[in-house]
UniProtKB/Swiss-Prot annotation:
PANTHER family xref list: PROTEIN ADENYLYLTRANSFERASE SELO, MITOCHONDRIAL
Catalytic activity: L-seryl-[protein] + ATP = 3-O-(5'-adenylyl)-L-seryl-[protein] + diphosphate; L-threonyl-[protein] + ATP = 3-O-(5'-adenylyl)-L-threonyl-[protein] + diphosphate; L-tyrosyl-[protein] + ATP = O-(5'-adenylyl)-L-tyrosyl-[protein] + diphosphate; L-histidyl-[protein] + UTP = N(tele)-(5'-uridylyl)-L-histidyl-[protein] + diphosphate
Cofactor(s) listed: Mg(2+); Mn(2+)
Amino-acid positions noted as binding Mg(2+) in the UniProt annotation, renumbered to this chain: N245, D254
UniProt GO MF annotations: AMPylase activity; ATP binding; magnesium ion binding
Domain of life: Bacteria
HAMAP family given in the database record: YdiU_SelO (MF_00692)
The protein, known as: Protein nucleotidyltransferase YdiU
Family: Belongs to the SELO family.
EC number: 2.7.7.-, 2.7.7.108
Lineage of producing organism: Bacteria, Pseudomonadati, Pseudomonadota, Gammaproteobacteria, Alteromonadales
Residues at the active site: D244 (proton acceptor)
InterPro entries per the UniProt record, alphabetical: SelO (IPR003846)
Role played: Nucleotidyltransferase involved in the post-translational modification of proteins. It can catalyze the addition of adenosine monophosphate (AMP) or uridine monophosphate (UMP) to a protein, resulting in modifications known as AMPylation and UMPylation.
The organism of origin for this protein: Shewanella halifaxensis (strain HAW-EB4)
Amino acid sequence: MRFKQDFFEQLVGYYSQVFPQGISNPHWLAWSEDAAGLIGLTQPTDELLQGMSGNAQIDGASYYAQVYSGHQFGGYSPQLGDGRSIILGEALGPQGTWDVALKGAGPTPYSRHGDGRAVMRSAVREFLISEALHHLHIPTTRALAVIGSDVPVWRETQETAAITVRLAKSHIRFGHFEFFCHSERGAPTKLKQLLDFTISQHYPDLSCDAAGYKAWFARVVTDTAKMIANWQAIGFAHGVMNTDNMSILGDTFDFGPFAFLDTFKEDFICNHSDPEGRYAFGQQPGIGLWNLQRLAQALSSIIASDDLIAALNMYQGELVKHYLILMRGKLGLTTSVTEAELDDQDLALIGGFTSLMERNQLDYTNTWRRFGQLDPSSSHSSLRDDFVDRDGFDAWYQLYQARLGNVEEVEQWQAARNRANPKYILRNYLAQEAIIGVEEGNLAPLQQLQQVLQNPFDEQLEFDDLAKRPPDWGQGLIMSCSS
């Protein structure tokens, strides 16, 4: 790997230098060849294993943990920071740079009495979800590898430590700006320096002046809205949408007790630590705006309030616009830019269908996938038999056919639905089965699941079992933040 060190060299005071604590008996548990290509790597090697496990230094790496703060479940925490993640620097790849971070590499000054380790199960989950979201075309950080060890760590019970090698276009979060707004570490000078660095590194078409700041914040709002629209369309619940878990680039970031919907539930809670449902599936769009408001508050000494408000007022429209693009693709609806009056009609049609799904306790992903088998020219839908409330479905289907209109090339239409509606998602029970395999020394379930998730829209008939509804024990699994 070749590195540059722009964050480390230009933002002194925004991090603490800290070196990994090596792990005993390091061994590869998972490797993403696709992610490796982003930073010019091909195959895992013994040299890489020693470096990424913290047992040897990597040439050109700087090793640091960033400091930030954030709103956690609505309350402000004045100092957080990378408590178990150590960044090596920005690796140079064929098409740009990627931060390389070792998550679980040992304690840092921001560990808050933690051991700085990650347990194997959380490392495997982060690896799988990072790669799954990428192949579902959802903006996300990436996972290069998981490195196992025989280091014991204690959570509720004794577990084994592992390291996830994470790649991110940037690790800058909403919480970075909050920290340098509210702390006494040279603010507001450091706040402006961070903003200028972010723009120059990641928005090179914008200037570091009032006009550039205005355009930048509007872009952050738009990118965040698009990210969350993607989540809602695919049925993904993040679980911990604290502001320190929000990427400034609109990438899905910091995976904990996430889940994809099994049976559709608007109020689905995937996080055992969120009994009130602050971060429930249906609350995510509103929380996205709330988090952006906290970011705007942190930037209010630099960016004019009118510009911040104008950008925030764009959020709902951007969210709905992108959500409609995705959902029309799932349903096979077409529209032109001159038919904006169809937006309300289509939102009602989409909402009517998801409500039917919820009342009939249907699987979200599998129900959408059935549109690839639908004959849209037929008055009788093969979907009808999936519903207990068939009268309700008939009423909805009549509205749907009227909106759809005439479809001349049915096979092409069906193929397009299969390109919009995945067959395979990372269901929590599948991740759990892969983790059990790793615990038993069998990497085959993990490797097979990784392979399938790389092509989620393909039939892959030999893996049909991985697309079925979960067994009773695996339905709607709720995870904890323990990692």
